[in-house]
Amino acid sequence: MVGNKWVVNGQKVWTTSAHKAHWGLLLARTDMDDTKHRGLSYFIIDMNQPGVETQPLMQMNGHASFNQVFLTDAEVLPDFQVGELGDGWQVATTTLMHERRAADSLRSWGQASKGDGPIYDQERVETETTMQPYKWYPQRAGRVDLIMDRAKETGAIKDPAIRQEIAKLMTLHKSAEWTARRARAAQEQGKPQGPEGSLGKLAASNVARAAAKVHTLISGADAMLTGEDSPMDGTIAEILVSFPASSIAGGTDEIHKNIISERVLN
C-alpha cells in the first residue's frame, strides 16, 4: 500500500471479455509474508483506469473472447475491497462457484434440449471488424435436434454406429441438465456451494466434445467447409475449431477434476 491506495502490478491471462468490461474482479496479494492462498485480498477494479491494459487473444476460430490483462502501478482504493483483508481466497472461490453454476444454468440446458432459439446466438454479434458473430457455444453445439436433422439430411441416421453416438450425446446432455437441476434445488434450499458447479462445467465440456465428434462422423470431410453452401452455414466447421475453448473457460477441466477429487472423493 502506498499512502491510502493499493498499487498493483501483475499479469492475468485467459480473462474472458476483459476488452469489453468496465469493471473487473481482482485477486491480489496484500501480505507478502503469508504463503499460497493466505494473504490474498479481493477487489473491484476499473478496467478503463490508467495502468490497466487489455490485449485480446485471437483464437483459431477467428474470435477473440479471451484476453491477457497487464496491471502496471494500477491504483485501487480500500473502498473497492470486497470482504476482509487477507480473506480474498474465500470470496474468489465463492464467486467462481456462482460463475460455473451460471454457465451451466438450468435455463441454458433447458432451451438447448428443446431447440429453442436460433442456431446462431444473435445477441453476441461482435462490433469490432476483426471479430465475427459466434455461431456456436457448448449448449447450442450439443443441440440434439440440429444433429438429428443433419443425420437425416445426409442419410447417416441409418448407420447404427451413428445412432449410438447420438444416443451417447443425448445421455450426456440429459446428465448436464439434471446436474443443473440439482444445483438449482440446492441453491433454493439455501445449502452452501458444493461441487455441482465443477460437475456442471465438466458436463458442458463433455457435451461440446461429444457434439464435435458426432458432427464430424455425420458430415465427414464436409465438416471442414465454411460459407453459405457448407453444412449448417459453416456452423459445424466453427464448432470443430471452437469446442476446445470449453475445456479452458470457467477454469480448466483439470482444475475442476482436482476440486472434485479434493472435496468429494478425498
PLM features: residue spans?
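A short core secondary-structure module
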Residues: 4-5, 9-57, 67
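Alpha-helical interface subdomain recognition
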Residues: 5, 98, 102-266
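Glycine-rich phosphate/pyrophosphate-binding beta-alpha loops
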Residues: 13-19, 60-61, 245-250
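Tryptophan-centric aromatic hotspots in well-structured domains and transmembrane helices
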Residues: 14, 23-25, 42, 66-70, ...
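Short Ser/Thr-interspersed hydrophobic loop/turn segments at strand-loop and sheet-helix junctions
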Residues: 27-28, 45-50, 73-75, 96, ...
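Flexible, small-/acidic-enriched active-site or ligand-binding loops
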Residues: 48-75, 84-90
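Long, acidic (Asp/Glu-rich), low-complexity accessory segments flanking structured domains
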Residues: 74-102, 108-109, 115
